[in-house]
Amino acid sequence: MKIADLMTLLDHHVPFSTAESWDNVGLLIGDEDVEVTGVLTALDCTLEVVNEAIEKGYNTIISHHPLIFKGVTSLKANGYGLIIRKLIQHDINLIAMHTNLDVNPYGVNMMLAKAMGLKNISIINNQQDVYYKVQTYIPKDNVGPFKDKLSENGLAQEGNYEYCFFESEGRGQFKPVGEANPTIGQIDKIEYVDEVKIEFMIDAYQKSRAEQLIKQYHPYETPVFDFIEIKQTSLYGLGVMAEVDNQMTLEDFAADIKSKLNIPSVRFVGESNQKIKRIAIIGGSGIGYEYQAVQQGADVFVTGDIKHHDALDAKIHGVNLIDINHYSEYVMKEGLKALLMNWFNTEKINLDVEASTINTDPFQYI
């Protein structure tokens, strides 16, 4: 399996297009044409993680957090530059799966909920998928070759189906004027043409490409086409809602997930003895969604990186919070390993996958 093949597989199951616009996901360092010798999953790509990959003979690291986030201005032999230089020197490919793994139905938040032993887990804060229905009008004799070109360039595809067009016949009319150079008709004379309206669906990211292809392959000098926006609720969403088996107190639940996640500290906001049943989870830094979680029926909102003023606001408004630290996302190492092994087995790909044993939590606890 080459890196390009791995990227295609990852994009199929955890689409990079579902990442936030500000994020930096995908192949950050590497060569798509090289063969994968093994995959190491990690929360962060630190120097220790790179050394671990080298020791195992694996040339591919898939990290959750992007090593390259802001603009890199230099690659010196220290700090992040040292890590990047070592990756390049040892021909190690680095792939980041960040917010696209966060919003995935099988991603980080699902992994956290399962690690906490919760049930009835479902995605919340669903994204809106944007599609376009494309309409254009073309002379009857040109329909076949035109559709062929669109299909060859990846348009008019629906899941496992290609060449997905709808046609309806009609009669078009126009009058070329001035410096027009018409394919059909004469200057200053109204022309009537038997035309076919062709309709097909595209994803939002294909819009500019579709416009380019229509202009390139349409026989008319100035083709007419429409893009009609359609929105649908996506399967992807930031966070999950889940439940405990039996109602328990806020303090007992906080202690329980601290033990199950095996993390050194947990903080919570709210009355210790308050009973909870439904839990909303956004791993990493999810503050900003706590009030929405309550509106969706959550008794407590679980996330990390909670700041003092956000916690105080929540307390004043009676919103229960549990801070499980950002590093709690480490569960994705084993979680992603399991997903990869399942995908590889399905595709009959024989490739070693291991979860990094390196603890990349920058904090020390006393």
Curated annotation (Swiss-Prot):
Protein keywords: Metal-binding, Zinc
Source organism superkingdom: Bacteria
UniProt keyword Metal-binding present: yes
GO cellular component, one term: cytoplasm
Keyword Metal-binding assigned: yes
Residues annotated as binding Zn(2+) 1: 64, 102, 329
Listed GO MF terms: metal ion binding
Binding site for Zn(2+) 2: 65, 326, 329
SUPFAM superfamilies in alphabetical order: NIF3 (NGG1p interacting factor 3)-like
Residues spanning the membrane: none
Sequence similarity: Belongs to the GTP cyclohydrolase I type 2/NIF3 family.
Subunit comment: Homohexamer.
Protein name as it appears in the record: GTP cyclohydrolase 1 type 2 homolog
